[in-house]
Amino acid sequence: MSLELLSKLETKIQAALETIELLKMELEEEKQTSSSLSEQNQQLQQELTSWNEKVTGLVGLLNEEVN
């Protein structure tokens, strides 16, 4: 191989490595976002369960008053 071809190959390899590093950083950001959204989802599900229990209790009280 000529030095020119080796230089081009080195440039392409360097660009590929930089792309891989950028993709790794993006993946880490996405993992953090996913984790945060998962925690938020769990909290919202707990709040929904709590509200459903409260509403069920209030409906039960209303039914007792009506009967």
From Swiss-Prot:
Stretches of the chain forming a coiled coil according to its record: 3-59
Annotated organism of origin: Shewanella halifaxensis (strain HAW-EB4)
Subunit structure: Homodimer. The ends of the coiled-coil dimer bind to each other, forming polymers. Interacts with FtsZ.
GO CC annotations on file: cytoplasm
Record carries keyword Cell division: yes
Function: Non-essential, abundant cell division factor that is required for proper Z-ring formation. It is recruited early to the divisome by direct interaction with FtsZ, stimulating Z-ring assembly and thereby promoting cell division earlier in the cell cycle. Its recruitment to the Z-ring requires functional FtsA or ZipA.
Keywords of the record: Cell cycle, Cell division, Coiled coil, Cytoplasm, Septation
The protein, known as: Cell division protein ZapB
Compartments in which it is found: Cytoplasm
Pfam families: ZapB (PF06005)
A biological process term (GO) from this entry: division septum assembly
Family membership noted in the UniProt record: Belongs to the ZapB family.
